[in-house]
């Protein structure tokens, strides 16, 4: 899972630097609305998916009134049209045979599908049929621990995470990524918090069963395509089976 971890870390850094605040808030609001509707409750204590979405929004300094408005939309209050927003996945390939699973939240399937296809085609990718790559991924839980918030021995943190039920632990400088069975995400998260670890995020993720390492040129093109897709307003996340070296990751960040 090391290649995924490195790419995930690079994307986290670049998204903070590149993504417009307004666009970020729109994506976070859609997450909250869908979580509220799917979980059947506007109370984060009773709706774990909503709690994760709200925590993520707060971490991005999203105003509380925006968060509440998104929750109200999910509850159908004030004549809002939460039912119009649906979660949908698109599939395809980036240069180098890199598989892409694209998660979107949209109120217009035709618009989103058109935007995704156009972006992929323009950047050397190829759209795929439903099921063409989704079988390559597994749903997992991802918990992020930031050791710059509280200095702890990384090896000790790893042992605590494994004892809590983690399936894999990746350490990249001060960031520790803990991967879990998705159904155990809430329990593992609570265990880590109770152990005093500085948990800064928890979310659903999709992990590739196997990864690919294309040559440098194709890897850079694949990363650029993923970045372009994630810049689309309706796209929430893009999962891939891309594996890259630390050197290539740095090259991409530096542009």
From Swiss-Prot:
Record GO cellular component, one term: cytosol
Single biological process term from Gene Ontology: regulation of DNA-templated transcription
Subcellular location: Cytoplasm
Keywords associated with the record: Cytoplasm, DNA-binding, Transcription, Transcription regulation
Pfam families per record: TACO1_YebC_N, Transcrip_reg
PANTHER family linked: TRANSCRIPTIONAL REGULATORY PROTEIN YEBC-RELATED, TRANSLATIONAL ACTIVATOR OF CYTOCHROME C OXIDASE 1
Xref: HAMAP family: Transcrip_reg_TACO1 (MF_00693)
Family from the record: Belongs to the TACO1 family.
Protein name: Probable transcriptional regulatory protein RoseRS_4362
Organism: Roseiflexus sp. (strain RS-1)
Lineage, highest ranks first: Bacteria, Bacillati, Chloroflexota, Chloroflexia, Chloroflexales
